Amino acid sequence: MSLFKGFMINLFLTPIPDSPMNLLTIGTGIIGVIGGILVVKGFTFFDKCYNKNSTNNSNSDECLPIFIGGLLGGIIGIATGFSITIIIAITLAIKSIINCVESQ
């Protein structure tokens, strides 16, 4: 019974054989991406509040948070050595670049 339980725990913890604590690294990677997006969203929000008189209504401040969030998530993913985090972060960054180019 203990052998089976150990096998199930190993199966659950290692979707990709990168590190022994994959669930933890997924969590930190996702927190990194979300945290990066929230931090830059906060900066752009306060910037909009203080610069209400500015006339340029560009869409660049909408795709910058996703780009930097993806970048931060990628850095955290590389630091924790988890490949899915890096892939998610890179796709977020590329998606934000495409959105920026399309909105111009």
From Swiss-Prot:
Keywords: Membrane, Transmembrane, Transmembrane helix. One of its GO terms (cellular component) is membrane. Its main location: membrane. The chain crosses the membrane at residues 26-46, 70-90. The keyword Transmembrane applies. It is found in: Membrane. It is a multi-pass membrane protein. It comes from the Viruses. This is Uncharacterized protein L891.
